[in-house]
């Protein structure tokens, strides 16, 4: 197994699919990385040379991935909550942020039902 951006990449899968195991790299980004490095997206990781894997490592390092991306997302949410804006309040209360209805739906975001006290 090759190790790119601190993630073990499966050897027996195509390069594009293997790169998506990295948090922050989806199909489109993986295809762009393959195009930038000149690596065949259909080639399996085990068939690539060490030089090609190093090129992939360097190209992935140019993107914000894994821990840095998680930290950036959490800091953005924390900033919204500290500002006290509407989106921050919704995050703080654990409700949907993007305008979805909450009268009947949003069970995942709101959590399990709480019994009504009489």
UniProtKB/Swiss-Prot annotation:
Gene Ontology CC terms, in alphabetical order: cytosol; small ribosomal subunit
GO MF, one annotated term: structural constituent of ribosome
Taxonomic path: Bacteria, Pseudomonadati, Pseudomonadota, Gammaproteobacteria, Pseudomonadales
PANTHER family assigned: 30S RIBOSOMAL PROTEIN S13/40S RIBOSOMAL PROTEIN S18, SMALL RIBOSOMAL SUBUNIT PROTEIN US13M
Region span, Disordered: 93-118
Protein family: Belongs to the universal ribosomal protein uS13 family.
Originating organism: Pseudomonas paraeruginosa (strain DSM 24068 / PA7)
Name used for this protein in its record: Small ribosomal subunit protein uS13
Entry-linked HAMAP family: Ribosomal_uS13 (MF_01315)
Keyword terms of this UniProt record: Ribonucleoprotein, Ribosomal protein, RNA-binding, rRNA-binding, tRNA-binding
InterPro entries, per database record: Rbsml_uS13_C (IPR027437), Ribosomal_uS13 (IPR001892), Ribosomal_uS13-like_H2TH (IPR010979), Ribosomal_uS13_bac-type (IPR019980), Ribosomal_uS13_CS (IPR018269)
Subunit comment: Part of the 30S ribosomal subunit. Forms a loose heterodimer with protein S19. Forms two bridges to the 50S subunit in the 70S ribosome.
Biological process according to GO: translation
Function in brief: Located at the top of the head of the 30S subunit, it contacts several helices of the 16S rRNA. In the 70S ribosome it contacts the 23S rRNA (bridge B1a) and protein L5 of the 50S subunit (bridge B1b), connecting the 2 subunits; these bridges are implicated in subunit movement. Contacts the tRNAs in the A and P-sites.
